[in-house]
């Protein structure tokens, strides 16, 4: 038996109209529980609930239920009570709660049945004894409960007494049917206000009229209705067509189905709303029958273990499920229609028959009887038989479906209007501003521990790691002040000693000290110390050892002191560790409540040993964690820079947070997704502030990130998935597989089968890459020269400028020429023996080959610039011939994420520090100089276009041309500059991440092969023109004159470039070269001035320092005069390459944009365009006045241990005032701040906190660091009110 759920209640029930339905049960009238309790309850059950004995919600009632019904909109539940009342309950789906709205006693006796109208959710029918049928309008009923009077249906044509069943017509909202014990079923029309038809049936066997116990309308046909008889001798289901109401259209009985049917009176009917060929009935014989009311066939018999199965109902929106209730069995059971005996059941039966007698009697009391259904006629429901659209969700949130004709497949991505994507995390990763995300999380924390974590991150984001640790690890302010005062007194004390003591007067050597004094005066200090130590004069021994400055004697005296007094005081223990410069004893044995002293000893004793300092900090963190000081342990792990330890702590708590979210009435999947997202956000923010350069090695952590990436990709958010994939280690096989999958699904990797491979890699077809939105701009240009023509250039050789284009005869590009005689790569051009293979020699000079001359042709191809030439020195009037190392791409293409392309040399552990392996790691400022002249024929100066197409200046499409994906394609020089010329076979590939360069901000670099030019900002876009583009010059070979047109001088690759107005220099060799009419200055470097910072969260814990067992002397020993060092663990990933020496001839390079440090992280509004301080407006002045006065009010009322919180609150509020002065807040945010002030004045602190949450949720980007200050002030104001 396919049992879905079973509830041990003797109760009637009703289904909700949900896809995953709820079930509500009410204690059945006329029954007594097993414990003889007379208690009555209305209980709500969820089919997804794990505990069948615990309802989702329960309400006690004054009477028991005869019937229950649920409105079609799921809002109201009506109960027919045995005390003559109709009770209305409201269902809150979000909280899964039932709330009683009223009890209405208009019936004179018991109410037997209630029924909601399926067309009008507010209309309710109720039926009872004494011909009482009432019609209720819930809208009016709930508005005026005391004065409301229900309506009656009108005049009855037939005698009726007890109303057993009511049913609304499914097509006509004003028509309903009733069944009573008077042998009549009545059809009522509310428009006519009377009974319009009555039905009766006379038995052919007995000649007596049968009483009707149930009535049910056809789901589609308004003239067809079914009735059931309660006669135990002849139980029948009669289907009527009202157009011929004298004779039943169909009779459903056991006699007509070879004995398959009910044997006793039928008590309920339910006609399936989704399939008119299915009718469910239950009877006193404890059976449930499934019928085909159209053909009259019995389909399936569902036997129950109880007696009197008085109600059975399909789930309205999940008709494959049905429930039935029994009296004797004391249960409500939910089953599925697929309750058939399977081969597995047969095998179980055979196994039981083969077991021994002993096993049978041992298990007979434990086994639960499972009664299988009897299939009379197998009939599939219509929702299985109908052909539905064949569809399947695919990776990336796409929907794949078969077309209506069944001959094709459609793939699309549905847009869900009610589903709003939250891009807060994605925006935070892009801008490195995590404050909006932190603000949102602080107002929806999971539990107290989770709130402490987000408070810690908020403090980190405001102060930065260094300031955060400095404040977190210092002792209380009072102790610091006393220490400073004691330091001053100590200096004065020593000054007094030095100035006041002067020996005077006569003295005599004591006889007991003669031997010691003799040794001292004789210079025998070793014996003197030995005698002093034997006599216990350790102080005098110290003086002798210090005076003679003998290190061995000093050690002996110290050893003697510690042997005698080491266990007497904490000062002695600390002095021992200090003398040895060893923190082992303090780290292992000092009371963990004084962990800040332990931290001071670690930083003092291991100031120059980073590895040992980190190990000791981790040891201290483990002690704190074992002692349940979780938050202090996290602070120490942050000081040690150990993301792995913090990740382990958070991963261990993952299931706890997930269960907490699950308790908030969310499904298991929803709770898991929300918890996983929160964890990823939390760890991402932490790693950004603590261990940005660290490599993730924790397998469990990688697994969580991969799960998040998989879910993110499944929704189509590939950009966010790729951002996280770049964080994970590239050598992990699962990360590699996931990255390939995401890259292919996002269309950022070109299938190798669609690429045309050449000698230097595949030349991808732009169309096959899936790029869109960038139209190709047609430009006239000459065809490229033949592979062996004189104009054919190497991969790093720009061609001569101003040369007459020489058409080429198409020659297939084969990987191996038939004859290949390699020339000297450094020799002069022009020597060609036989056939050369220079087309594929990246460093070879051009050769001379006679080719036929033809007129230029128009092509839509826009060649990319030579990535290894000096871009700024080339005139924009010339065009580059196709680079042998570049792909055949044109137009503006989006950045292509390439899996590890190959390059010339391996940059050692420097993936993101610089874009080029031999570029300068630091900004270099040098005086720009013009290039030295080269002895070549002068070239004509190209003037701006005045008239005619010939004078127009061509330009490439606005955008960037990128290298091909995959293969052995070369990479731009902004990533890896070329090594000296060498043979191709000697090149060693290395893995380079192209996205790090493409998506990076432009930086100025220098290269020993490609001198840089002065960086300029973006130039205005000029209109494109169709003009042939000339080839570029070769910096490694003399220029060849073709035709009579004079050549423009080539670029000297080892000399500074000449400055030319209107040509923006490209730090990125793939950036578009856009001409301008005037020089454009480079943008000034971003200011590194520290941004305003905001306050820590209110709930951050203030731990009182427990230092009662450690003396101030010990604290003075631990405390060093040097500042506390907070150096992170050294990591190879964080090392920057040494700067490459540059010559004085290099041009001046403005410094690149510096990455904002963690401590300066502010919201985008803080980074907004120049904000001019305009002063706080009159409308906003109350914000400053009230917050300032309120802070002044609470300050003297707040305990001293919260002084830090007050100072922090003051600092954050000053940030808010600065924002107001600069007019950086939007009007809605200002209005809400003013509303908070009004609520605080009225002492409505809870409402004020809700407005604060609204700002944090809907205006998180404006909240910045000041928002926590407002929250803290609200809390302190409430505490001191």
UniProtKB/Swiss-Prot annotation:
InterPro entries in the record? Sec31, SEC31-like, SRA1/Sec31, WD40/YVTN_repeat-like_dom_sf, WD40_repeat_dom_sf, WD40_rpt
| Cellular compartment(s) | Cytoplasmic vesicle, COPII-coated vesicle membrane; Endoplasmic reticulum membrane
Give the main localization category: membrane
Q: Which SMART domains match?
A: WD40
Q: What cystine linkages occur within this chain?
A: none
Q: Which UniProt keywords apply?
A: Cytoplasmic vesicle, Endoplasmic reticulum, ER-Golgi transport, Membrane, Protein transport, Repeat, Transport, WD repeat
**Could you tell me where the Polar residues compositional bias lies?**
1037-1047, 1118-1129
Which cellular components does GO assign to this protein?
Answer: COPII vesicle coat; endoplasmic reticulum exit site; endoplasmic reticulum membrane
Q: Where are the WD repeats?
A: 5-46, 60-99, 106-146, 158-198, 207-250, 261-301, 329-371, 392-412
Q: What topology in the membrane does the UniProt record assign? A: Peripheral membrane protein
GO molecular function terms here?
structural molecule activity
The record's region (Disordered) falls at 960-991, 1010-1157
Cited function: Component of the coat protein complex II (COPII) which promotes the formation of transport vesicles from the endoplasmic reticulum (ER). The coat has two main functions, the physical deformation of the endoplasmic reticulum membrane into vesicles and the selection of cargo molecules.
Give the protein name, as stated in the record. Protein transport protein SEC31
């Amino acid at each position: 038996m396919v049992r879905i759920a079973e509830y041990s209640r003797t109760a009637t029930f009703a289904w909700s109209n949900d896809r995953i339905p709820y079930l509500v049960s009410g204690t059945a009238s006329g029954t007594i529980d097993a414990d003889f309790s007379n208690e009555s309850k209305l209980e709500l059950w969820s089919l997804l609930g794990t505990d069948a004995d615990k309802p989702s919600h329960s309400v006690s009632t004054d009477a028991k239920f005869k019937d229950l019904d649920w409105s079609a909109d799921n809002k109201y539940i009506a109960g027919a009570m045995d005390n003559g009342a109709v009770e209305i309950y409201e269902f809150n789906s979000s909280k899964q709660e039932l709330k009683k709205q009223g009890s209405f006693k208009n019936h004179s006796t018991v109410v037997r049945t209630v029924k909601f109208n399926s067309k009008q959710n507010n209309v309710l029918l109720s039926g009872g004894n004494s011909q009482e049928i009432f019609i209720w309008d819930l809208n009016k009923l709930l508005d005026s409960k005391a004065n409301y009077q229900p309506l009656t249906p009108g005049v009855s044509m037939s005698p009726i007494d007890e109303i057993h069943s009511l049913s609304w017509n499914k097509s006509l909202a004003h028509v309903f049917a009733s069944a009573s014990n008077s042998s009549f079923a009545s059809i009522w029309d509310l428009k006519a206000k009377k009974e319009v038809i009555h039905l009766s049936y006379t038995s052919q066997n007995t000649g007596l009229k049968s009483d009707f116990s149930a009535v049910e309308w056809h789901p589609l046909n308004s003239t067809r209705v079914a009735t059931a008889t309660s006669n135990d001798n002849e139980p029948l289901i009669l289907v009527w067509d009202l157009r011929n109401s004298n004779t039943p259209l169909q009779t459903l009985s056991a006699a007509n189905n070879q004995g398959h049917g009910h044997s006793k009176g039928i008590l309920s009917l339910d006609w399936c709303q989704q399939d008119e060929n299915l009718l469910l009935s239950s009877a006193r014989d404890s059976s449930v029958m499934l019928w085909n009311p159209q053909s009259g066939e019995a389909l399936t018999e569902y036997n129950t273990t109880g007696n009197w199965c008085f109600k059975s109902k399909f789930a309205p929106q999940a008709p494959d499920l049905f429930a039935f209730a029994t009296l004797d069995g004391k249960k409500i059971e939910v089953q599925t229609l697929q309750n058939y005996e399977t081969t597995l059941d047969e095998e179980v039966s055979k196994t039981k028959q083969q077991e021994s007698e002993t096993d049978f009697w041992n298990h007979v009391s434990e086994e639960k009887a499972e009664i299988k259904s009897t299939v009379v006629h197998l009939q599939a429901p219509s929702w299985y038989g109908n052909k539905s659209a064949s569809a399947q969700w695919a990776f990336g949130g796409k929907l794949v479906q078969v077309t209506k004709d069944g001959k094709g497949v459609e793939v699309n991505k549905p847009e869900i209007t009610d589903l709003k994507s939250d891009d807060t995390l994605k925006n935070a990763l892009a801008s490195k501003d995590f404050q909006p995300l932190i603000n949102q999380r602080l107002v929806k924390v999971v539990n107290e521990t989770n709130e402490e974590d987000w408070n810690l991150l908020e403090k980190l984001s405001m102060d930065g790691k260094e300031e955060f640790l400095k404040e977190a690890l210092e002792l209380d302010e009072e102790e610091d002040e006393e220490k400073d005062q004691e330091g001053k007194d100590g200096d004065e004390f020593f000054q007094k000693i030095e100035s006041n003591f002067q020996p005077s007067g006569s003295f005599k050597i004591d006889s007991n000290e003669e031997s010691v004094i003799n040794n001292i005066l004789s210079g025998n200090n070793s014996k003197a110390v030995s005698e002093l130590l034997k006599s216990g004069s350790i102080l005098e021994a110290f003086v002798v050892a210090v005076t003679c400055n003998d290190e061995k004697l000093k050690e002996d005296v110290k050893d003697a002191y510690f042997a005698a007094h080491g266990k007497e005081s904490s000062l002695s223990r600390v002095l021992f560790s200090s003398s040895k410069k060893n923190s082992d004893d303090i780290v292992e044995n000092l009371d963990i409540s004084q962990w800040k002293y332990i931290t001071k000893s670690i930083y003092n004793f291991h100031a120059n040993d980073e590895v040992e300092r980190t190990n000791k900090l981790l040891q201290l963190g483990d002690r704190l964690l074992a002692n349940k000081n979780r938050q202090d342990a996290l602070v120490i792990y942050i000081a040690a820079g150990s993301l792995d330890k913090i990740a382990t702590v958070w991963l261990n708590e993952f299931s706890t947070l997930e269960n907490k979210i699950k308790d908030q009435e969310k499904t298991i999947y929803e709770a898991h997704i929300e918890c996983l997202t929160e964890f990823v956000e939390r760890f991402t923010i932490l790693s950004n502030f603590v261990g940005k350069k660290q490599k993730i090695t924790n397998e469990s952590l990688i697994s969580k990130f991969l799960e998040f990436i998989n879910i993110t990709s499944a929704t189509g958010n590939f950009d966010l998935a790729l951002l996280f994939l770049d964080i994970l280690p590239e050598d992990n096989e699962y990360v590699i597989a996931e990255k390939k999958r995401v890259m292919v699904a996002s269309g950022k990797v070109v299938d190798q089968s669609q690429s045309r491979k050449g000698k230097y890699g595949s030349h991808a077809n732009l169309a096959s890459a899936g790029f869109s939105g960038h139209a190709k701009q047609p430009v006239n240009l000459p065809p490229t020269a033949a592979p062996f023509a004189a104009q054919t250039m190497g991969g790093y050789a720009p061609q001569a400028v101003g040369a007459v284009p020489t058409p080429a005869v198409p020659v297939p590009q084969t990987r191996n020429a038939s004859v290949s005689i390699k020339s000297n790569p450094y020799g002069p051009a022009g020597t060609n023996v036989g056939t050369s293979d220079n087309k594929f020699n990246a460093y070879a000079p051009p050769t001379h080959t006679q080719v036929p001359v033809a007129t230029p042709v128009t092509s839509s191809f826009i060649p990319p610039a030579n990535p290894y030439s000096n871009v700024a020195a080339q005139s924009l009037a010339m065009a580059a011939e196709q680079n042998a190392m570049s792909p055949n791409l044109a137009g503006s293409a989006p950045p292509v994420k390439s899996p590890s392309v190959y390059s010339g040399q391996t940059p050692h552990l420097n993936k993101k520090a610089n874009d080029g392996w031999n570029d300068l790691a630091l900004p270099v400022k040098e005086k720009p100089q013009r290039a030295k002249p080269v002895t070549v024929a002068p070239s004509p100066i190209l003037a701006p276009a005045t008239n005619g197409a010939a004078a127009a200046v061509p330009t490439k499409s606005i955008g960037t041309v990128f290298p091909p994906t995959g293969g052995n394609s070369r990479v731009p020089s902004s990533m890896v500059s070329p090594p000296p010329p060498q043979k191709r076979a000697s090149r060693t590939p290395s893995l380079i991440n192209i996205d790090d360069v493409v998506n990076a901000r432009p930086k100025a670099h220098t290269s020993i092969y490609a001198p840089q030019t002065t960086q300029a900002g973006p130039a205005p876009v000029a209109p494109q023109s169709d003009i042939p583009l000339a080839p570029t010059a070769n910096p490694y070979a003399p220029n060849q004159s073709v035709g009579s047109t004079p050549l423009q001088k080539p670029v000297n690759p080892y000399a500074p470039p000449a400055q030319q107005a209107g040509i923006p220099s490209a730090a990125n060799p793939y950036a578009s070269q856009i001409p301008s009419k005037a020089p454009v200055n480079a943008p000034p470097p971003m200011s590194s001035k520290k941004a305003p910072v905001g306050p820590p969260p209110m709930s951050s814990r203030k731990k009182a320092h427990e230092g009662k067992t450690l003396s101030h002397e010990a604290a003075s020993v631990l405390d060093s005069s040097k500042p506390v060092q907070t150096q992170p663990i050294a990591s190879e990933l964080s090392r920057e390459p040494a700067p490459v020496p540059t010559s004085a001839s290099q041009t001046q390079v403005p410094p690149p944009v510096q990455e904002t440090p963690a401590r300066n992280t502010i919201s985008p509004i803080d980074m907004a365009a120049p904000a001019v301080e305009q002063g706080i407006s009159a409308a906003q002045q109350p914000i400053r006045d009230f917050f300032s006065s309120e802070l002044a009010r609470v300050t003297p009322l707040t305990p001293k241990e919260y002084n830090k919180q007050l100072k922090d609150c003051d600092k954050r509020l000053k940030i808010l005032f600065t924002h107001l002065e600069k007019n950086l807040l939007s009007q809605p945010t200002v209005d809400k701040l003013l509303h908070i002030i009004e609520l605080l004045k009225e002492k409505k602190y809870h409402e004020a906190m809700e407005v604060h949450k609204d700002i944090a949720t809907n205006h998180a980007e404006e909240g910045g660091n000041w928002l926590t200050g407002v929250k803290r002030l609200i809390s302190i104001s409430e505490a001191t009110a």
